[in-house]
């Protein structure tokens, strides 16, 4: 085994370990909160067109609220679910609602909204396939 292969193996091992750890930690908190958020959303926005947005991408401290930051501050690159409610009205005005704590409205650029919508549609299609 040459030097290059050894480094590659170590890199892969470390990457897998981190992913395994992150999945365990995130799933424990975020999954439970995500389903709770969905239940609350059903109650709160019965008469509105509400969309649940699920995102699987690296942890972004600048996007999240203080509550989320304290929860995940030990690991800056957590992969997991982050639940956000996007109503049609909030999309129109370029803001969104965070579910875990009542963070109020936060501004979003149009590009960010487009990206979120793309993820939302993709996730929704995946969920629909699972339901069938």
Regions found by a protein language model. Give the residues of each.
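Acidic/polar low-complexity segments and flexible, solvent-exposed patches
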Residues: 2-132
């Amino acid at each position: 085994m040459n030097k290059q292969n050894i480094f590659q193996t170590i890199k892969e091992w470390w990457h897998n370990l981190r992913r395994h750890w992150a999945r365990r930690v995130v799933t424990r908190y975020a999954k439970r909160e995500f389903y709770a958020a969905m239940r609350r959303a059903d109650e709160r926005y019965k008469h509105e067109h509400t969309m649940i947005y699920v995102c699987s991408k690296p942890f972004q401290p600048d996007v999240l609220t203080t509550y989320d930051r304290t929860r995940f501050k030990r690991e800056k690159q957590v992969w997991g679910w982050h639940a956000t409610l996007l109503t049609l009205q909030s999309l129109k005005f370029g803001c969104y609602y965070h579910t875990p704590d009542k963070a109020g409205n936060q501004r979003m650029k149009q590009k960010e909204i487009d990206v979120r919508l793309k993820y939302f549609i993709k996730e929704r299609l995946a969920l629909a396939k699972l339901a069938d």
